Regions:
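Donor-nucleotide binding loops and adjacent catalytic segments primarily
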Residues: 167, 176-262
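C-terminal amphipathic helix plus adjacent low-complexity
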Residues: 332-376
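Conserved nucleotide-sugar phosphate-binding/catalytic loop shared by glycosyltransferases and other
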Residues: 4-11, 25-79, 237, 244-246
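Short N-terminal targeting/anchoring amphipathic segment
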Residues: 78-95
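A donor-sugar binding/catalytic signature common to diverse glycosyltransferases
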Residues: 90-93, 255-298
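Nucleotide-sugar donor-binding patch of glycosyltransferase catalytic domains
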Residues: 284-325
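A short, glycine/small-residue-rich beta-strand->loop->alpha-helix junction that serves as a flexible
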Residues: 7-20, 190-199
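A nucleotide-sugar donor-handling region in carbohydrate enzymes
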Residues: 120-192, 223-225
C-alpha cells in the first residue's frame, strides 16, 4: 500500500496533525510506503517527528486556502504525487488543489480530511461555502472529524463523520495533579489569518500573564509556535514594565509529552485539535475562544460544545470576563477531582483507519490487510 499526504500548514497545526497521524499509523502498523508534503508550520512539525516534506512549497505559491494548484509549486506537487503512484492520496485543507488534482488525474483515489466547518459553516458567506463544498465534493471519500458530527452533503461521495483524529501518543500521557506547572497553549500558529484572530490570541496570553503575576508559587509556560506572537507578548511585558519570573514563552514546536506530562492545568485557545486532546486526557483545562470573524465563531462553537458535555475538569472562559475570572476558574479546577473519567469523547482515529482499510480491501480484493488486525 502506498499513501501520499498533502497537508495544509496553516493557520495552526490542526490540518497537519490528523493527516500525519493517519499516515504514520498506516506506515507503522500496516507497512505502508508513505510520502508527505506540507509547508510553513506543517513542515516544522513533521521535522520534529523525523520526516521531511517531499516537495518544498514556495511561500509565494500559497493562498489563504492552500497551495495554488497552477503555480510552480502546485505543478511540482502534482508531478510528485503522480510519479509516486499512490493507492490513496490524503488531502487536508486544500480545496483548490484537491479539485485540480482530481480533474487532471481522475483515477487517483482521494481521501479528504475535513473540519465540520468545512462542510457546514453558518458564519461564512454563502458564495464561499458553496465554492468550498463543490471543490471538496471531488474527493472519493470525505472524513469529517471534530467535536460534533455533520450530515453528509448531497453532492459528496463516500462519507464518514467522526470525533477528532488526534495524536496516537495522547491517550498514553499522564499529567501531574500535584505539580505547580500551568501550561498555556496558543495553538499551532496564526498564519494567513486576520488581525482579529492574532489579537485574540495575544489577549489570551495577556490574561495568563496577569494571573501569573499574582500566582508566584506556580510556573507558567506559554507555547505559541509563532515568533511574531512571542515578540508581541514580550513587548507587552516591556510596555507594562512587568518582570514576571515565573513565566516562560516557547516559540518552537514542542513534543506533546513535554507539554502535557508535568502540567497541572492547561489554558488553551479553543482549537478543535487541542480541545480534543484535552478531552481525551481528561486534563484540567480552561478553553478560551479568540475574538475574530468566522474563525472566532468556530471557536465559540467549540466552546459551546464543551459546555454541553458538562465535564467537571474542562471549563470555558471568555476574554471579556477578564483575568480575575480566569484566575477564579483556575483555582476552582485545582479542587476538582481528576478521577472523573471522560466516557463521552472517544477520538475518531480507529473509525477513520477502519474506513481507509476497508477501501483498500475493496480496491484490491487480494490485499493481505486484515481488518481484524489490532489498530489501536
Amino acid at each position: 500500500m502506498k499513501v501520499y499526504a498533502v497537508l495544509r500548514g496553516f493557520p495552526g497545526l490542526g490540518r497537519v496533525i490528523a493527516g500525519f497521524e493517519l499516515l504514520k499509523h498506516l506506515e507503522n502498523k500496516f507497512n505502508a510506503i508513505v510520502k508527505v508534503s506540507t509547508y510553513l508550520q506543517g513542515d516544522s512539525y513533521i521535522n520534529t517527528k523525523g520526516y521531511t516534506s517531499s516537495i518544498e512549497i514556495d511561500e509565494k505559491d500559497i493562498s489563504s486556502v492552500g497551495v495554488i494548484s497552477v503555480s510552480k509549486s502546485g505543478e511540482k506537487l502534482m508531478e510528485d504525487i503522480v510519479s509516486f503512484n499512490p493507492d490513496i492520496v490524503i488531502i487536508d485543507g486544500e480545496p483548490i488543489f484537491l479539485q485540480n488534482l482530481k480533474i487532471s488525474y481522475p483515477n487517483l483515489y482521494i481521501v479528504s480530511l475535513l473540519n465540520p466547518f468545512d462542510v457546514n459553516n453558518p458564519y461564512n458567506q454563502k458564495s464561499s461555502q458553496d465554492f468550498f463544498s463543490y471543490m471538496y465534493s471531488f474527493a472519493d471519500l470525505s472524513i469529517v472529524h471534530g467535536l460534533w458530527e455533520e450530515q453528509k452533503p448531497n453532492n459528496f461521495k463516500d462519507y464518514l463523520s467522526v470525533n477528532s483524529i488526534i495524536r496516537d501518543s495522547i491517550p498514553t500521557i499522564s499529567f501531574s495533579e500535584k505539580s505547580n506547572s500551568i501550561v498555556c497553549l496558543l495553538g499551532g500558529g496564526s498564519k494567513t489569518v486576520n488581525s482579529g484572530f492574532t489579537y485574540g490570541t495575544i489577549e489570551i496570553a495577556k490574561q495568563v500573564i496577569d494571573i501569573a503575576s499574582f500566582n508566584e508559587n506556580f510556573d507558567f509556560t506559554i507555547y505559541t509556535s509563532d515568533k511574531d506572537i512571542k515578540n508581541k507578548i514580550i513587548n507587552y511585558l516591556k510596555y507594562k514594565e512587568l518582570s514576571v519570573e515565573n513565566i516562560r514563552i516557547i516559540d518552537s514546536i514542542s513534543d506533546e509529552r513535554e507539554i502535557y506530562t508535568n502540567a497541572r492545568l492547561v489554558i488553551a485557545r479553543a482549537g478543535r485539535n487541542t480541545i480534543s486532546e484535552l478531552l481525551t486526557m481528561n486534563m484540567p483545562s480552561i478553553i478560551i475562544p479568540t475574538t475574530a470573524n468566522f474563525r472566532g465563531s468556530e471557536q465559540l462553537c467549540n466552546c459551546r460544545k464543551i459546555e454541553s458535555f458538562n465535564f467537571q475538569n474542562i471549563k470555558t472562559h471568555h476574554l471579556d470576563s477578564g483575568a480575575e475570572d480566569l484566575n477564579h476558574k483556575m483555582h476552582k479546577l485545582f479542587n476538582t477531582s481528576v478521577d472523573i473519567k471522560n466516557e463521552v469523547f472517544i477520538p475518531g482515529n480507529l473509525k477513520a483507519i477502519e474506513k481507509i482499510l476497508a477501501i483498500m480491501k475493496k480496491k484490491s480484493p487480494g490485499n493481505s490487510i486484515a481488518l481484524s488486525t489490532n489498530i489501536n
